[in-house]
């Protein structure tokens, strides 16, 4: 068995490729079912965010398992192999373990130390459990990854002052406004006519950061007005005009700055729409949706300044050097957590031998106990029989305690294999045969 991860991220693929592998809510169950049907996969879960799609799995054979997952990704995306494959990465065993720990800690994020990824890793664990696709190995790994993410944020300064995708989007708007006035600095958004399209979690974060940057009024559009009004109620200090998304054209004509973050699978704003409406001289569009809410052809329209999630790098790079230094604090913790998991993983190699040894001694115990009880005759009470049986079990447990503890203790793989060989020879254990025995139901 091998732990493997196959996927792509903002580091390996542009948004136009990533959006092809964004799994919408309605296709999550089907995706899990298709992955579970793959013979090579023993356990599996999916991490899907705006910046990454990663399949974590326990596979029988690493090469065959990775190829099977790659085939799933090709089929799901509809992309040709020569287009998708250059953007995919895969890690096995130690590298896969290290990767998920780093992802959960925010070390692999566009914004180092951002907190939202931890919630997304938690969701990956929950999805795997809900779809009954996690077994003891992957459940242990992903649960420990969540704990590692929490530990990094509580024991280091990496999470302090970390920006998110939403805050980076607001900062990008401030930066572009400053540059338009000939200044390489962030400017307040007080005078901007702002609109936010979408009322989900990312939009909530957008509103938080817009409020902190001086925005005191905006238009909020959503497919259902009630959800927009519920979100608006959480921000009483901002004057929010809630509208249905049907009013998008009107909103675009009145706004100077529009943020989009919807779950739409197709663009809701394109060049054709922008050309038709009567707009302000300059309209800034910032799209943090994946798949993209704004078509790439919007950039070709005069008076339109359009940005997507990949453009956030301009903002992130401004304070990345300082955050890289903070990331060094987390690396030691991640190495420690990886070592703990891998030691546990290695200790599993002893389980078949331990079970075989325990089974052999248990057979001897039962056989000898039966002989002894038969010699005691009918005068031996049921209570006395229980005492003798408990005594025999206690002796077996005492005999097993030291070798089992030694076999499970952290040690090199070669040392563990040597210890297992000695035990198997001394007790004449046929571990391979015991593994192939059918289980009693």
From Swiss-Prot:
Residues that bind NADP(+): 198-203
Keyword field: Chlorophyll biosynthesis, NADP, Oxidoreductase, Porphyrin biosynthesis
InterPro entries noted in UniProt: 4pyrrol_synth_GluRdtase, 4pyrrol_synth_GluRdtase_dimer, 4pyrrol_synth_GluRdtase_N, GluRdtase_CS, GluRdtase_dimer_dom_sf, GluRdtase_N_sf, NAD(P)-bd_dom_sf, Shikm_DH/Glu-tRNA_Rdtase
Catalytic activity: (S)-4-amino-5-oxopentanoate + tRNA(Glu) + NADP(+) = L-glutamyl-tRNA(Glu) + NADPH + H(+)
Pfam families attached to this UniProt entry: GlutR_dimer, GlutR_N, Shikimate_DH
EC numbers on record: 1.2.1.70
Pathway connected to this protein: Porphyrin-containing compound metabolism; protoporphyrin-IX biosynthesis; 5-aminolevulinate from L-glutamyl-tRNA(Glu): step 1/2; Porphyrin-containing compound metabolism; chlorophyll biosynthesis
UniProt binding sites for substrate: 49-52, 109, 114-116, 120
Site (Important for activity): 99
Molecular function per GO: glutamyl-tRNA reductase activity; NADP binding
Organism superkingdom: Bacteria
Function: Catalyzes the NADPH-dependent reduction of glutamyl-tRNA(Glu) to glutamate 1-semialdehyde (GSA).
Other information: During catalysis, the active site Cys acts as a nucleophile attacking the alpha-carbonyl group of tRNA-bound glutamate with the formation of a thioester intermediate between enzyme and glutamate, and the concomitant release of tRNA(Glu). The thioester intermediate is finally reduced by direct hydride transfer from NADPH, to form the product GSA.
Family: Belongs to the glutamyl-tRNA reductase family.
UniProt cross-references to PANTHER family, sorted A to Z: GLUTAMYL-TRNA REDUCTASE 1, CHLOROPLASTIC
Domains: entry comment: Possesses an unusual extended V-shaped dimeric structure with each monomer consisting of three distinct domains arranged along a curved 'spinal' alpha-helix. The N-terminal catalytic domain specifically recognizes the glutamate moiety of the substrate. The second domain is the NADPH-binding domain, and the third C-terminal domain is responsible for dimerization.
Subunit structure, as described in the record: Homodimer.
Protein name, per record: Glutamyl-tRNA reductase
Organism: Prochlorococcus marinus (strain NATL2A)
